[in-house]
Amino acid sequence: MLYIINLIFSCLYLSQVKEKNTFYFLIKILPVILLWVVIIGGQYEVGQDYRNYLDFFSHPHYETRFEPLFTSLSNFAYNLGVKGQGQFYIYALINAIFVFAASHKLGIRNWGIFYFLLITVSTFFNNQMNGIRQCTAAVFVYWAFVELYTSKIKGISLMAVAGGFHYSAIVCLAFTYIEKITKLLTKYPKILLIASCLMSLMPADEQLNQNIVELLPDEVLEETHYEVYAEEETATASIELIYKLSKLLLLPLYLLSLVLLKTGTLSDKDQLFFRFGVLSYSLRCALLINHLIGRFSSYFWIPSILPIYYLCENLYNRKKYVELFFVLVYASFIYFIKVFMGTAEYKSSFIYFQ
């Protein structure tokens, strides 16, 4: 129920906010940020890694196996007296602030629609409950994507910060020249979308896991625990189809959104990030060919919502409210099913009610 309250309150609140200055914008949306932190920070036994992180946050100086920035920040918080459950709040606050700051820099205008899609379509919000390191890295990667449009130095620096929270983020350096790569790979967006969705259905889990493990150096396997992941993901491959279908069901909305490329209503920057959103969704689907490499899809969760966002914004501006309603309902119905079923990261379990 708390997830739904957050969704309704935050979307209504954000829909009233307009501010050009990023700092003042963050001040104005403080109630939304605080609610985000209360929910994510107050999780209790949500996700299979909850206990592992709780133990680490309680004794961070005993562990050195995590990435340097993550370990350093956790140790710093510990030395300040923020231990155990308290550190979940820190990472929730970091994620909330920088997601909104990066999105403001991107030029998001309709914050109610954007936040609705961020929660219901990207899956980022609830996945913070489990993949703490990778989700924090994903926030800095998203920010890097936005900065790369105007400053390669800022973008690359943010990629390096992301790598300090999760080593896998370094692969996103491949998008340093985001404009050229996006235009090249999205020249035929409809073909890209359909092909990536078909690719995700290819059954290649076990063999691909083995190939990846063989290619990675022993040091990387030890630091990232990918060898352990490979064994786990192969064992759970039988449940994969349901997860894939929950993503592939969004394909019609992406195909529908392509009409915006012909209307001339998008600015050059919006069109670039619209196309990058198409590419992000395509990669998000294509990486589902294997659950192990599917972990890299987290870096495209947030930008993948942009085509649907631009579509909804266009419908809103044209006062096509009925069409907008049906698009939002279709985009979010999987999310509401997960929330009401209370599965995995959508489990409603918080320390406040224990």
List each model region and its residues.
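Signature aromatic-anchored transmembrane alpha helix within multi-pass, membrane-resident enzymes
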Residues: K190-C197, Y316-F336
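Short acidic/glycine- and proline-prone juxtamembrane loop motifs at membrane-interface regions
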Residues: Q128-Q134
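Membrane-interface transmembrane helices that cradle and orient dolichyl/undecaprenyl
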Residues: C135, V141-K154
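Membrane-interface alpha helices of multi-pass inner-membrane proteins
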Residues: F124, K154-I178, Y281-R284
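Alpha-helical transmembrane segments and terminal signal-anchor/GPI-anchor hydrophobic tails
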Residues: V46, R51-D55, T64-T71, T176-G294, ...
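Transmembrane-helix motifs of polytopic, lipid-linked glycan transferases
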Residues: I90-L106
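TM-lumen/periplasm interface segments of multi-pass membrane proteins
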Residues: Q16-A92, I337-Q354
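Transmembrane-helix signature of polytopic, membrane-embedded enzymes
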Residues: S103-T120
